[in-house]
Amino acid sequence: MLHFFLPKDLQPIFEYIPSSALHVVGWSSVLPSIITVGRRLAFDEGKHEMIGNLTPMLPPHVQFSTEHQHDHHDEHEHAEHAHTGLIHAEHIGDSVADKERFGVTVLEVFFSQLFSEAGFFIDLREHGFSLNSETVFWNPPNLWYHLDHNFRTGLIKVYDGYFFGPFSYAEEGLADLGILTEDHAANQKVVDLLLSHFGSDGERNVLFEIDPFAKSFDQFFSYLKEKNISLDANFMYFGLYLVTLYICLDKLKVPLDARTAFLNARNRLTKEKPDSQEEPAVS
C-alpha cells in the first residue's frame, strides 16, 4: 500500500527496504512526510535553499551543479562530455583509480551531509554525478529530508564509536537513536548488523555490495522487532539514504575506505574531537 504514496524516484530504492521494517517503523507517522517529500520533488520546492545550505558542507573537490542532469544520457551527449573531459558516473569506465576516487568521494558526501542541521539530499545514486580530472559535480534529485537533531548527532556518535572507539560512545549514539538496550552484547549486535559492511579497524578497504547489505538490513530490523524496539520516520529516511549509497558503490566493484572518508568529513566539519564526549559542533 505504501508504494501508492511514494514518489516515482523512491520506488526502486524502497525495493531494498525489508518487509521486517514494516513491523518496526511507525508508518502512520511516515505517510505525511512521504507526501511532503513527494511534493518537493514534483514542484522543485526548496532545492535552491538546500544547495545553499549544503554547499559549505561538501568536500572541496565536490560542487553542486544544475547543468549536469541526472537523467540517463544519450551517446551524442556522452561523446560531447568525453571531448571536454567530463564523464557521467554511469560511464566511469574500468579505471580502478577513477572508481576509487569517485567511490571515496561519494562516501565523504554521505558522511558530510550527516553533519548538516539543514537537512540532506537522500539520493546518492550514480546518475546524479559527473566528474572530470579535478572536480566531482552533483545534481541530486530534489528528494531531501531533515533529520531530528538528536537522531542526526546520534548517527555521528555511532559511526565515530564504531570506527574509532570507545564503544561506549557508539552506545550513546544508540540511545539518541532510540535503540539502546540494557544488554551490552545486544547493543554490539545492533551496531554490527547496521555498520559491519563499512569495514572495521582491522579491515579498512571493503567492497560495498547491495545484496549482502540488504540481507543484514533485514536482520537488523528483524532483531529490533524481536526486542520490541520501534523506530520513527527518521530511520526510514536514513535507511533510504544508506540504500542509495550501496546502490551507487555496488556498481564500482572496488574496495573503499569508509573509515577515512568519515574521518575527513568529521575533521572538516567539527570544531572539537568527539573524544571529549561532547556533542559534535557543526561549523
Language-model features: locations:
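Helix-rich C-lobe and terminal helical cap/extension of kinase-like folds
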Residues: 2-283
